[in-house]
Amino acid sequence: MSGPILIFDSGIGGLSILDEIRKVMPQQSCCYLFDNARLPYGELEESELISGCVSLIIEQAMRINAGIVVVACNSASTLVLTTLREQLSIPVVGVVPAIKPAAKISKRRHIGLLATPGTIKRPYTKQLIDAFAEDCRVELFGSSELVMLAEAKLAGTAVDMQKLELLLAPIRTSELDTLVLGCTHFPVLATEIKQSLGQSIILLDSGKAVADRVLSLLKGNGLPKTASNKVVDYSAVFTTDDIAQGLKKRLVEEGFTSIEPHSSTNLR
């Protein structure tokens, strides 16, 4: 049997990726690691993000003898995938903003990317747009505050619609017909975003594509096996800081049976 999937994000927005994975692999063991001590990632310096993420993910992957790592964070994926793939012997899957499918379906040839400021400014994002949406008008909208709104919603707090309306105001005045949710936190707010922008707008995220990629890898023959002497809770959550009771409740509802700290000297 291959080891559990290790899903990583700065917060619990990566649960949107986990949900898609469970749709296609309901019996697959998963562990979740989130670096809530440094949330939100979209405002971190690149050097800090890279050094912290790489050490954190590698340590936890080795600790649980993971069979595959999913970096369920756009901000991190744009920076750390190459290094992780060089240092880990297991597959590493990242999240790519759904620019390509958005360009294919936009009738107006006018799309938007809603992401963290970090993802918006990365050269990789521009490369995606140049490669797959050259014939489209692409508008970029960056927000870290939406990340915290999503975190609050997952903890059981009602979404502040007045604040959401203010944050989405630049999009509402645009004539785009397709909006890419380029942060794994943002699908959590999909209902509220549609309520604000109108039901006709098409929202796209990368969750299904990531799940399909993971399934494809698990069906292959190259995944390492867990050592027989390794014992791990296959439904564990690991955190880098304390979490609110509301978030703990949500994680239990997601089926996780233990929540414990990740101990590391390299987090800060």
From Swiss-Prot:
UniProt keyword Isomerase, yes or no: yes
Phylogenetic classification of the source organism: Bacteria, Pseudomonadati, Pseudomonadota, Gammaproteobacteria, Alteromonadales
Any GO molecular function: glutamate racemase activity
Catalytic activity: L-glutamate = D-glutamate
Superkingdom, taxonomy of origin: Bacteria
Residues the record lists as binding substrate: D9, S10, Y41, G42, N74, S75, T184, H185
Keyword annotations of the record: Cell shape, Cell wall biogenesis/degradation, Isomerase, Peptidoglycan synthesis
Pathway: Cell wall biogenesis; peptidoglycan biosynthesis
Function: Provides the (R)-glutamate required for cell wall biosynthesis.
The keyword Iron-sulfur is assigned to this record: no
Entry's family note: Belongs to the aspartate/glutamate racemases family.
Active site: C73 (proton donor/acceptor), C183 (proton donor/acceptor)
GO BP: cell wall organization; peptidoglycan biosynthetic process; regulation of cell shape
InterPro entries attached to this UniProt entry: Asp/Glu/hydantoin_racemase (IPR015942), Asp/Glu_race (IPR001920), Asp/Glu_racemase_AS_1 (IPR018187), Asp/Glu_racemase_AS_2 (IPR033134), Glu_race (IPR004391)
Cited HAMAP family: Glu_racemase
Protein name, entry field: Glutamate racemase
E.C. number(s) listed in UniProt: 5.1.1.3
